[in-house]
Amino acid sequence: MEQTLVLIKGDGVRRRLIGEIIRRLENKGLAIRDLKMMRVSRELAEEHYAEHREKPFFGELVEFITSAPVVAMRVEGEGAIGVVRNLMGATDPAKAAPGTIRGDLALSMPDNLVHGSDSPQSAARELRLFFGG
């Protein structure tokens, strides 16, 4: 079974959407294998977003993810990475289709509620960062 990292970002926590987002994941046949609410340190944020370090929005990403608690989840299921990516919808909520988490619930950038790993390599790296091992 494939595993992936899903983060419910601070805007989702503040808006009390944790249960709704988990319900949508489980309704797609995915299982939550690990879950924790945490504050992301600057160091963890910078490592998590390392691929964007040279981009102009890097600082904004780090500030946003460290500004409030997040819910980190190890999610498992058949084709979990693709299932999660489709369920999340487009990165920009204005472009996300109805029926997706961002299309139905997100307000605007950067408040797009969730993060999901984009490849098996990213999933392995991100799960190690957030859950160890």
Swiss-Prot record:
It is found in: Cytoplasm. Coiled coil: none annotated. Keywords: ATP-binding, Cytoplasm, Kinase, Magnesium, Metal-binding, Nucleotide metabolism, Nucleotide-binding, Phosphoprotein, Transferase. Its EC number is 2.7.4.6. It comes from the Bacteria. GO terms for biological process: CTP biosynthetic process; GTP biosynthetic process; UTP biosynthetic process. It catalyses: a 2'-deoxyribonucleoside 5'-diphosphate + ATP = a 2'-deoxyribonucleoside 5'-triphosphate + ADP; a ribonucleoside 5'-diphosphate + ATP = a ribonucleoside 5'-triphosphate + ADP. InterPro entries: NDK-like_dom, NDK-like_dom_sf, Nucleoside_diP_kinase, Nucleoside_diP_kinase_AS. GO terms for cellular component: cytoplasm. The active site is at H115 (pros-phosphohistidine intermediate). The keyword Metal-binding applies. It holds the Pfam family NDK. CDD domains: NDPk_I. ATP binds at K9, F57, R85, T91, R102, N112. The keyword Kinase applies. One of its GO terms (molecular function) is metal ion binding. Belongs to the NDK family. PANTHER family: NUCLEOSIDE DIPHOSPHATE KINASE. This is Nucleoside diphosphate kinase.
